[in-house]
Design a protein with these regions (language model features):
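Conserved alpha/beta core of the MobA/IspD/sugar-nucleotide pyrophosphorylase nucleotidyltransferase superfamily
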Residues: 124-166
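Nucleotide and nucleotide-moiety/phosphate-recognizing core
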Residues: 1-110, 131-144, 154
Length: 166
């Protein structure tokens, strides 16, 4: 089985609005994951109250930290996993196709929340995302691997969204 997990449970405090609802990106990412070959899509929605925001299968965070919640969810799944944060507005099936491990974006930032891996490879349980994915190989993700945390970053991403070929 090939499972896509969309991370959409954050508070989006720096953005000032819920990033998971901008541009219907959770649904868009789900479609891109399906195009890539994911047969099951799960949204890690954070809390029970947020589950109604999404039309897809939702899972509530099971631990205090995202790292531990991801670890616990992945431990219940067999096969390949493709992660994607809800603020990956440029990610598409072409990007997912070339990810093997943890991609590095065009700014040189490692993006562990966009990792692609076999569930058996997740062996480190930690509260820190960087530690959970530290043993995973790094691969090139380029511009499409960027995530967005502030209104300024989103404006920059919007410029790229207006272009046809990334």
């Amino acid at each position: 089985m090939y499972t896509g997990i969309i991370l959409a449970g954050g508070k989006s405090s720096r953005m000032g609005e819920d990033k998971s609802l901008i541009n219907s990106n959770v649904n868009r990412l789900a479609k891109e994951m399906e195009l890539h070959g994911c047969t099951r899509i799960i949204v890690m929605c954070g809390t029970l109250e947020r589950a109604d925001l999404f039309e897809l299968e939702c899972v509530i965070d099971s631990a205090e930290s995202l790292g531990e919640s991801i670890f616990e969810l992945v431990s219940k799944i067999e096969g390949r996993i493709q992660l994607a944060p809800c603020d990956a507005y440029l990610a598409d099936s072409e990007l997912f196709e070339r990810i093997d491990g943890v991609p590095v974006d065009d700014k040189g930032i490692r993006q562990p929340l966009m990792a692609n891996f076999d569930s058996k490879e997740m062996v480190t349980k930690s509260t820190k995302i960087s530690e959970v994915f530290e043993l995973f190989p790094t691969c090139d993700g380029g511009l499409k691997a960027r995530n967005t945390n502030t209104p300024e970053e989103f404006r920059e991403i919007q410029c790229f969204l207006k272009q046809e070929d990334l």
